[in-house]
């Protein structure tokens, strides 16, 4: 996918979450290119083009053309479902307490019912709710 990002952020490998645009973007002729990503999703820049455009909202007053793709996301799944290469439907756990795994169990960029593939298997996690969880890297 092609999009535009502030020139100071336009670096291959940069991972970011797209939160949407400003109301000032509505009248811009580049808004379809800038705002063509899905809100709340995590992306990684895979290529940086030389083309830049003026933009009063960004730090250096310019945006740069970049290629992006959905980024992989670290999360936790039930250990019995943690098989590299398998496809799962992501669901946030229903926890009764907040713990050190909260950011892993509730990652930004994934929504309930997202169809994902397990790319990597990490360590088993200690869950205060007694669930058997394993850290994984998902693509969607």
UniProtKB/Swiss-Prot annotation:
InterPro entries (UniProt xref): UPF0179 (IPR005369)
Pfam families linked: UPF0179
Domain of life: Archaea
Stated family: Belongs to the UPF0179 family.
Full protein name: UPF0179 protein Msp_0996
UniProt source species: Methanosphaera stadtmanae (strain ATCC 43021 / DSM 3091 / JCM 11832 / MCB-3)
Taxonomic lineage of the native organism: Archaea, Methanobacteriati, Methanobacteriota, Methanomada group, Methanobacteria
């Amino acid at each position: 996918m092609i999009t535009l990002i502030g020139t100071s952020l336009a670096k291959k490998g940069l991972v970011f979450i797209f939160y949407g645009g400003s109301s000032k973007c509505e009248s811009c002729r580049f808004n379809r290119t800038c705002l063509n990503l899905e809100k709340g999703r995590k992306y990684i820049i895979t290529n940086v083009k030389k083309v830049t455009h003026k933009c009063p909202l960004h730090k250096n007053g310019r945006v740069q053309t970049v290629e992006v793709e959905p980024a992989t996301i670290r999360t936790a799944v039930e250990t019995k479902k943690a098989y590299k290469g398998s496809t799962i439907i992501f669901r946030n756990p229903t926890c009764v307490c907040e713990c050190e795994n909260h950011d892993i169990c509730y990652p930004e960029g994934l929504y309930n019912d997202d169809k994902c593939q397990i790319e990597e298997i990490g360590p088993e996690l200690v869950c205060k709710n007694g669930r058997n969880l394993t850290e994984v890297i998902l693509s969607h």
